[in-house]
Amino acid sequence: LANRANILNLTRNTQFDMKIERPTHSAVAMATLLLLAAAPRLSAAPGRPGPPTRDPHTPGYVTATELPDGTNAPADQDGNFILGPTHLRAPEMTAQPGVPQGKVYDFVLSSSNSTIYPGIARDPGTFGTPDPADPAKLLVPTSHPHPYTRHLAVYVPAQYTPGTPAPFIVGADGPDHGLFTALDNLIAEHKVPAMVAISIGNGSGDAQGSERGLEYDTMSGRYAEFVETEILPLVEQQCHVTLTKDPDARATMGGSSGGSCALIMAWYHNDLYHRVLTYSGTYVNQQWPSNPETPHGAWEFHEHLIPDSPVKPIRLWLEVGDRDNYNPNVMRDNLHDWVVANENMAKVLAAKGYHYQFVFARNAGHTDRAVKQQTLPEALEWLWKDYQPAAK
């Protein structure tokens, strides 16, 4: 037991502040409480009604296959699917007896060690106001430099052979220990490759003017470059793994703005990532500061970028809930409807001939926990279905 993860090793003069192997249940619980405290609230603001419930058969929405209640889309099929209203937890989301468990390393990183993201924050209780000259642009004068810490959790599968290049998946808004459990089971069932999972916490806050918003909603290669230059070298050094350089063996995932971030990484650095998995992806106008090249933020993906660009080697799984976010901020630019945004994504992906699977979930809110517990194993299996390891 002396080697278990309840031993805390404090380190100095490194890129990180803390390293733990196999966090104890109490440590995981504390981290969960901290993350919940920092996470954006999903309830409607006082005086504002909650989002409407959408019918997946609304005229103008994509044609989709209605699945039997409680079942998932087939892991070997592309296209559009409707599931729910019952969401049954997939067995792979629970640790199974006899299944080898990967090793998990936890770190706490400081903004003082980042050259790409030194840190910003918005003053508490403030948000922003629409630009009088452009309702699609938000002015946030209360955003300013501010330090942060972020959590990083790295899962190394029990089946990893030291020295060999490992496939991996990068996740936003980490740590996501449910992902690690799912991988334990899926790897043991030979449904996905033995991959490393790198679950990166955000730099705090939410939406325009925050560190999280800057990282996840900016339409550029900046976040992928942060991961490539500041996170992956640390993972290789401290977790004793070799990470593949093959973009077809690299995936990204996330929910909400973390979902749009996942696609942004693969779109702007398609040389690094080919596989993307998103829940309630924020394919809306959330970018700040505004960029004249992409004035509508991630709404540009389905408005211009995907329709007007050559097809990229991206395989994309995406989900949205029937009660997903609908214009939750002060902007009234008609570019903040999560359901319409994800429906539009499915349309343009189909029109361009992408490999994609779109899930419309009934009885589901924004980044719905029950939906994720039902669908994540199938989504991961679909995401890696065509993966072929590079020839040695």
Walk through the language-model features, giving the residues of each.
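Non-catalytic cap/lid and distal C-terminal segments of serine-dependent acyl enzymes
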Residues: 61, 68-392
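Bacterial N-terminal signal peptides that target proteins for export
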Residues: 12, 17-30
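Short acidic, Pro/Gly- and aromatic-enriched capping/linker segments at domain boundaries
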Residues: 49-66, 90
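Low-complexity, Pro/Thr/Ser/Gly/Ala-rich linker/spacer regions in secreted
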Residues: 47-50, 390-392
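Short hydrophobic targeting helices and cationic amphipathic motifs
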Residues: 4, 8-10
